[in-house]
Swiss-Prot record:
One of its GO terms (molecular function) is nucleoside transmembrane transporter activity. Keywords: Cell membrane, Membrane, Transmembrane, Transmembrane helix, Transport. This is Equilibrative nucleotide transporter 8. Belongs to the SLC29A/ENT transporter (TC 2.A.57) family. Pfam families: Nucleoside_tran (PF01733). The chain crosses the membrane at residues 19-39, 57-77, 87-107, 119-139, 150-170, 187-207, 238-258, 266-286, 331-351, 367-387. One of its GO terms (cellular component) is plasma membrane. Induction: By nitrogen deficiency and 5-fluorouracil plus methotrexate. InterPro entries: Eqnu_transpt (IPR002259), MFS_trans_sf (IPR036259). PANTHER family: EQUILIBRATIVE NUCLEOSIDE TRANSPORTER (PTHR10332), EQUILIBRATIVE NUCLEOTIDE TRANSPORTER 8 (PTHR10332:SF77).
Amino acid sequence: MVDEKVIVDEVETRDAYRVAYVIHFLLGAGSLIPWNALITAVDYFGYLYPDKHVEKTFTVAYMSCSVLVLVLMMTWNTRMSYRVRMNLGFSMFIIAMMISPLIDWVWKGEKGENVSYMLMVGSVVLCGLADGVVGGSLIGSAGKLPRQYMQAIFAGTASSGIIISLLRIATKASLPQTPQGMRTSAHSYFIVSSTILLCCFISCNVLHKLPVMQQHLKFHQPLHSTLTIWMVGRKIKWPASGMLIIYSVTLSIFPGFIAENLKSQLLQSWYPILLITVYNISDFVGKSLTALYLWQSIKSATWACIVRLLFYPLFSACLRGPKWLRTEVPVVVLTFMLGLTNGYLTSVLMIMAPKTVHASEAELAAIFMVVFLGLGLVCGSVIGWLWLI
């Protein structure tokens, strides 16, 4: 099915005190903080725009723009350096994150305001564009580095979900459940998220000065010709297909189906927030497990991605099946497994795929994988929008 011969990592420059690892972890977290911030504030946006399918609209807008940028990065040989692209992306993230509180301060929490809703969707589009710039640059760069840096990035992306979920729970629980309390908690939530992104902005300017990154830049060779793109694509077509399936399944269920379709009389408005937190924790566990055990067979990992299609009938049973399945416990268990398998298989494929090609093609292979990850996100968000589960 696929050539499973893996090229051994090149000898790396010593990463003193694991600074480069920590920064890659932080940048991975920062790259997904805006997305997690938007979907975890589901209660706030549901209050402001009760007649809109906020989760599904945000997902399609964000993912479509991200994939567009990734495709352009893969096919167009940009002259912007890694550092410039990262600075641009995080600047766009910070601006987009501050739009939500600014909108609320101007309209003072008026519900159903169409102009504010369009501006909010515009900020989501800006986040999606920034995600493509940051994600493509960061993962493409890590594709040429030793495998622990790719693992650090994806562990970081998963940790961002936990950080944001806990932050949302803290801000929601610490203030009264009134319209004003909800607005104040959301303001604090987005401002703290922006502060974390500012730390990422500073860190990416430190990263390029480290010896391990100097080694990476020294051997950097742009290979973005059309011929090379498809040559590399053919070599990693199976892990890329696996990535497409992973995120088509995940995004068609999470967050839209979980946030909108599943209800709990016991937990009420806390239910979607707690389910999103469970998913984020299990996703982090899955992406961290590759530091302990890395599944070496890309063929087997790709088949495991196909097996995840079973989540469709299982979640459907939790919505329409027997009464005992339409309770909180089965949903929490399934959500945990959805996140765990998503995290582990993503990390395995993203670590292994760039190592199955020549070192000079590793960056392009990593970007190619991210493009298919993004295509999976778009497919999943569209399936979720069409209510096919």
